[in-house]
Amino acid sequence: MSNLIILPMLLPFVCALILVFTKNKNRISKILSITTMIVNTMISIALLIYVVNHKPITLDFGGWKAPFGIQFLGDSLSLLMVSVSSFVVTLIMAYGFGRGEKRVNRFHLPTFILLLTVGVIGSFLTSDLFNLYVMFEIMLLASFVLVTLGQSVEQLRAAIVYVVLNILGSWLLLLGIGMLYKTVGTLNFSHLAMRLNHMENNQTITMISLVFLVAFSSKAALVIFMWLPKAYAVLNTELAALFAALMTKVGAYALIRFFTLLFDHHPSVTHTLLVFMACITMIIGAFGVIAYKDIKKIAAYQVILSIGFIILGLGSHTISGVNGAIFYLANDIIVKTLLFFVIGSLVYMSGYRNYQYLSGLAKREPFFGVAFVVVIFAIGGVPPFSGFPGKVLIFQGAITNGNYIGLALMIVTSLIAMYSLFRVMFIMYFGDADGEQVQFRPLPIYRKGLLSVLVVVVLAMGIAAPVVLKVTEDATNLNMKEDVFQKNVNTHLKEVNHK
C-alpha cells in the first residue's frame, strides 16, 4: 500500500509531460487530463480510507529510511488535502476544456495546471523540509507562468506583485530551513518533532518558528495579502478558481502542520501571534468584500477572509480549534471553487464585473440563483451547509482559549461576508430597470453540470459531516499528540534519536 502514495503526484506529472506533445489535439488532451484527475481522485480517496481505518503510511525513496532519505507521508491530514485538491482540479480541467475553444491548449495551459497540481500534492505528501521547499517551488513556477500569461497592462502589474512577494516568501522559507537544520541537525518531520520536544526553552527555536510563520503567511495571504486581489481579479475563471482553491490553502496547510507537530512549545508567543494575525486578516477581508463592486475582487477578499477563520482555529491551540481549522480548510477548497465558478458564470452571462449590471439575471437562470444561495450559506457557516461544522469547532476552540475578541470578529465578519454576497444577489433579483437592458447570454449546459456537482458536494459535506469529522479528528490527534505521532510514524527513529 505504501508504494501507492506516489501515484497522486506521479499521475499528473506524467500526464503533464504527455500533454506537451498533444498541444494541437484538443480532444486527446481533454480526455487524457480529465481521466487522469478522476483516477487521481479515486486513488487518493482510497488511500485516505485506508489510513483512517489503519495507520499512516510512509514511502522511503531509494530504500533510505528517514531521517536520511526522501520520504512521503500519507496521514489523514495530507491525504484529505490531496483528495479534495484532486477533486476540484478535475472540475477545473473540465471547466477549462468545456469551452471547446481550439486554442484551449495555447501556451500549454493544461500542462502548467497539472504541474501546479504536482507541486501542491507534493507539498501535502512530503515529510521533510527541503522537499517541501522543492514542491513549493514547482508549484510557484507553474503559477508564475499561469498568472503572467496575458496581454493586458493590468495583468502584467498584478503578475509583478505576485511574483516578487512569493519570491521573497521563498527566500524566507529557505532561510528558515537553513537555520533549523543548523540548530537541530535534521529536516525530517518525525525526527524534528522528537528533537524539538527536548528543546522547549530554546529561544533560537522560537525565533526560527517566527521565520517560518512569516514565510508561510506570505503563501497563505495571512496579513501579507497584497498579491492576491489583483492577481485573482485578472485571471480567467478556471485559473482564478484553481488559485483560490489551492494556492493559499497550501500555505494554511503548512502552518497547521508546523504549528501543531513542530512549533507548539511556546504557544504564548507563536499561537498568540497566529490569533492576532488571523484577526487582522479577518478585518482586512471584511473591509475588502464590502468596499468593491467588482465581483471578482469581492470573491478574492472572500478568500482572504476564510484564511483568517482557519488560522483563528489553529491559534486557539486546542483540539476542537485545530479540528475545526482542518475541517474548514478542506471545506473551503470546495466552496471557493464553487464561488469562483459562480462569479465566473456571472461575468460570462452579463459581460460585466460590476454587480450593478446583474439586474434580472436570477429570473432568467433560476438554477443559478439556487447555486448562489448555497455558496452564500456555506461561506456564512449556516447549517446544514458545509461551513457550519468547521466554524462551530473553531468557536469552541476560541471559547476554550478565552479568545472572545477573535470569536466576536469571526461572527461579525461571517455576517459581513454573507451580506456582501446577498447584496449581489439582491441586484440579481430586484435590481433597477437599467440592469434589465443588459443582454444576458445563457449559461452553457456543462457549466450548469459542474455547478450542480459542487452544490451537491457542499450539501453532502454538511449533512455527512460526522464522516468527514472522523478524518479531521484523526488528523488532529495525530499532529497534536506527540505520543500518537511517534507510535504511528517512523517508530524506528526512537533508536536513531538516542544514538
From Swiss-Prot:
One matching Pfam family: Proton_antipo_M
Keywords from the UniProt entry: Antiport, Cell membrane, Ion transport, Membrane, Transmembrane, Transmembrane helix, Transport
Annotated compartments: Cell membrane
Transmembrane parts of this sequence: 1-21, 31-51, 77-97, 107-127, 129-149, 160-180, 208-228, 239-259, 272-292, 307-327, 329-349, 367-387, 402-422, 449-469
Gene Ontology CC terms: plasma membrane
Record carries keyword tRNA-binding: no
Membrane topology note: Multi-pass membrane protein
Single GO MF annotation: NADH dehydrogenase (ubiquinone) activity
Single GO BP term: ATP synthesis coupled electron transport
Disulfide bridge positions per record: none
Subunit text: May form a heterooligomeric complex that consists of seven subunits: mnhA2, mnhB2, mnhC2, mnhD2, mnhE2, mnhF2 and mnhG2.
Family membership: Belongs to the CPA3 antiporters (TC 2.A.63) subunit D family.
PANTHER family linked: NA(+)_H(+) ANTIPORTER SUBUNIT D1, NADH DEHYDROGENASE
Designated name of the protein: Putative antiporter subunit mnhD2
Protein's organism: Staphylococcus epidermidis (strain ATCC 35984 / DSM 28319 / BCRC 17069 / CCUG 31568 / BM 3577 / RP62A)
Gene behind the chain: mnhD2
